[in-house]
Amino acid sequence: MNALDPDTLIHPDVATAIIHGRHGDPFSVLGIHTTREGVVLRSFQPEATSVVAINPESGQEIATLHRVHGDGIFAARLPGRTGYRLKIVTATGTDIIDDPYVFPNLLGDLDVYLLAEGRHEDLGRVLGAHVTTMHSPDGREVEGVRFAVWAPNATRASVIGSFNHWDGRCHPMRKRVEAGVWELFIPGLTAGTIYKYELLGPNGELLPLKADPVAWYAEIPPATASIVASPAPFQWTDEQWMQQRGRLQAADQPISIYEVHPTSWMPAKCGDWNTLADRLIPYVQSLGFTHVEFLPVMEHPFGGSWGYQPLGQFAPMARLGTPESFASLVNRLHEVGIGVILDWVPAHFPTDAHGLARFDGTALYEHEDPREGYHYDWNTYIYNLGRNEVRAFLISSAVHWLTYFHADALRVDAVASMLYRDYSRKHGEWIPNMYGGRENLESVSFLQHLSTVVKSRAPGAVLIAEESTAWPGVTRPAHEGGLGFDYKWNMGWMHDTLHYMQEDPVNRSWHHDQMTFGLVYAFSEKFVLPLSHDEVVHGKRSLLGRMPGDEWQRFANLRAYYGFMWTHPGKKLLFMGGEIAQEQEWSEGHGTDWYLLDRPNHQGVQRLVADLNMLYRAEPALYRKDCAWDGFSWLVIDDRTQSVFAYMRYGADSDAPVLVVCNLTPVPRHDYRIGVPQGGYWREILNTDAGIYGGSNTGNGGGRMADATPSHHHPASLQLTLPPLATIILKPES
């Protein structure tokens, strides 16, 4: 064949576009094509010295491709539309490959339709990189990796990696115009392949290389590339847990959460997900927590963000290992009956050039106007939740963690910043909604849709809101006009009660209402009481460090506070280190001071937390009616002079009631009369002043007999000794 055969020549402009990586439709040029004179095969191989089409079975030559352009375009006429492979000789050796440009469309019609509509709920399955097997035009099964990325305004998209010397000209992708998605199947690639996307913007400008927004696996920072994840499905053995998690996470069940930053919990001994599981799981079991909540495990470039500036919304952070080892951690927690909550950040994302920022040369994931699209507090971009494709991206991320990784709940971060357009903004720095108000209607719609999708796609999973304002109906169902969350962090309770506990006891009478005000609204939502990581950072000091007095009083205050918290309506959350009375505040580089457990006072607090969890789970009155007024009644609410609080907790009619009394001064109170609903013997089932916890062992000798003296609107009453800076808990013997 003549090398200058006009049938195989490419128009000079087309050749230039291919060679310079500026052609937006490579499938119209490369691969096999039928012309008026016959079948033509074209291939772009810039490093090749020769290219031969060979029979896939026998390896015999079908045709030699001739160089029709000096910079790497080869072409030949074939005898017909036959199957072939390419034998490529370069200066470094010979490779035999399947041609990526002979495979048909990869995404199905329904996926493309849902992508175009912005209504796809499982983008983790459709976009990104997936090891798969495709059928070649001649019917052979060809293994490789399917890539797909949403970049509607890009004029060219390519997959790059060491397999093509990071040359964006070698593997340009096909654009599915109707959905704005670029796709390509590259034969021969396998799990573990490191890759990025090279994009040209709307004006043909070369953009910063991009990590895959939907990658399931990524390099360890500061490296920024994505990695093709293993195709083998994880072998889950948590069926029993998954079937019952909906019941175990209901509002009438005990939920006690241990919040963990995975890389700093025990960094010297837990360097990966597997060793973390080895130590964390028995520890959490021994303390009696029902759930572990992880600060964001999604891949994030800056460790100092604690995960709250994620870019890999589908990838567990590689700092601790593979996606499979993270799945194993979840599975092992489930096997021993411990639920897994993941912090999840749909409010904003970092500005790193390799991430989502101006992904295709336009404000694709973010708003164009910084008054809507930039968060000045965190120097991050805000997701454009008015764009259906962005909503679908985040919805799919949530579904991904709850289904593929079996997470039981997502704690949605920074909800308040999503709900208000003027959140942390000065006058002139925000744009009102369509009605002139400050409410972010797009975010409201997104959160309602999120709750609806989660309930249908992940039965039994729950959503928890970190929401710090008085927005009504956060935990009301979406179909009733609420946001649809299952629980909400009670930030007001946390701020008020911590402020009270920080006061010297001599001043507490002036702040008495801070301990009682939370009950005014305690049943307006379904609440979690959070003593989270946010309360032990940035100069706030540790929980122990906030307590006033000498060493004995500081520990006693903390123990009494925990007793108050564990008996107060609402689910419980404690950040790691709180259970051992950490002395220093936390940072991601400091972690937990486990050496403190060599000291009796710290051992005592740890034992108290374990006993509180055990008691909480054993007494239905402490959880059955967490979200209902008839599960709680004040007995002593107004003794501000002595800083005493007393209340009853009730469960179902068949559940024994529980009496809680807090004395938050260092002065013991003797013969303190408190009314109770029935006579008989009331056993003291927990006393935070017990000697085993480091207290003074002041108490009631195991219990008290109620007499017939009416008090506090009850027919009987107890005369109790109230230990100093302590909470005592009693229940009727029969």
Curated annotation (Swiss-Prot):
Active site: 413 (nucleophile), 466 (proton donor)
MF-aspect GO terms: 1,4-alpha-glucan branching enzyme activity; cation binding; hydrolase activity, hydrolyzing O-glycosyl compounds
Single biological process term from Gene Ontology: glycogen biosynthetic process
Keywords: Carbohydrate metabolism, Glycogen biosynthesis, Glycogen metabolism, Glycosyltransferase, Transferase
EC top class, as a word: transferase
A cellular-component GO term for this protein: cytosol
EC number: 2.4.1.18
The keyword Cell inner membrane appears for this protein: no
Highest taxon in the source lineage: Bacteria
Signal peptide stretch: none
Pathways per UniProt: Glycan biosynthesis; glycogen biosynthesis
Reaction catalysed by this enzyme: Transfers a segment of a (1->4)-alpha-D-glucan chain to a primary hydroxy group in a similar glucan chain
Entry annotated with the keyword Transcription regulation: no
Description of how the protein assembles with itself and partners: Monomer.
Functional description taken from the UniProt entry: Catalyzes the formation of the alpha-1,6-glucosidic linkages in glycogen by scission of a 1,4-alpha-linked oligosaccharide from growing alpha-1,4-glucan chains and the subsequent attachment of the oligosaccharide to the alpha-1,6 position.
HAMAP family in UniProt: GlgB
Entry's family note: Belongs to the glycosyl hydrolase 13 family. GlgB subfamily.
Protein name in UniProt: 1,4-alpha-glucan branching enzyme GlgB
Organism: Granulibacter bethesdensis (strain ATCC BAA-1260 / CGDNIH1)
